[in-house]
Amino acid sequence: MVKKYSRKEHILLIGFSTIIFLSMLLFFLRIHPLIIYDADDWLYASYFRLPIPIWHDWNPSRVFPEIFMPLCSTLAVYLFMPLTHDYIWSLALMYGIVVSSFITLYVYAFALFLREKMKASVSNSIIISTFFFLFHFLVFKTSESGNHHMFYANDVTCYFYYIIPTILNVVLVIILELYPDLMDIFSRKNGILKGVIS
């Protein structure tokens, strides 16, 4: 079970998460902007479908990305386009916020895992998580195709189809490690309910 945190520890974790979020937002807005440009991006930014598997579609199991990407695109049009008057930049802003949020959640979950399971102090878990975060950018420094990073994808669609679901899965595994009682609750459900939940 997760321990209680002191006020100072909460402030440290919130400050750390804010720095990660702002650095990733700056990265995805200025250094590596998430601009829609290819046919997949244009198609899936506005491809609305039912939130259930479509059996005769080419990939019936792709539900989350095909719901989440157009939802983010629609929110961008209603929230940011009235302010920016630029469709492409509105989408890039929303995509940057969404991807930065998921990466922040990922690094935050890793810091909590270090604190709870590895018994690290909050300051040590923040230091280790900072290196963990930075190594995502350093690991491909000598790549022949440029300075790619572990959060790299060829287009915006790949972020929603691969990067975000992978991050979400890692965070869910960490949550199940931190709260093992959740697995007990899940294992007591019947098969149909398990399928609906997962």
Question: Which residues make up each language-model segment?
Answer:
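Start-transfer (signal-anchor) and selected internal transmembrane alpha helices
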Residues: M1-M24, S123-I128, I192
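Transmembrane signal-anchor helices characteristic of membrane glycosylation enzymes that use polyprenol
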Residues: K8-L43, F133-F140
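Extracytoplasmic loop-helix module adjacent to an early transmembrane segment
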Residues: S23-L71, V77-L83
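Juxtamembrane "helix-exit" motif on the non-cytosolic side of transmembrane helices
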Residues: L29-I31, L79-T84, A111-R115, L138-Y152
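Juxtamembrane segments of multi-pass membrane glycosylation machinery
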Residues: L75-V99, V107-F110, R115
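Transmembrane-helix motifs of polytopic, lipid-linked glycan transferases
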Residues: I97-T130, V171
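Membrane-interface micro-motifs in multi-pass membrane enzymes
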Residues: N124-E177
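Short hydrophobic alpha-helices at membrane interfaces in multi-pass membrane enzymes
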Residues: L178-S198
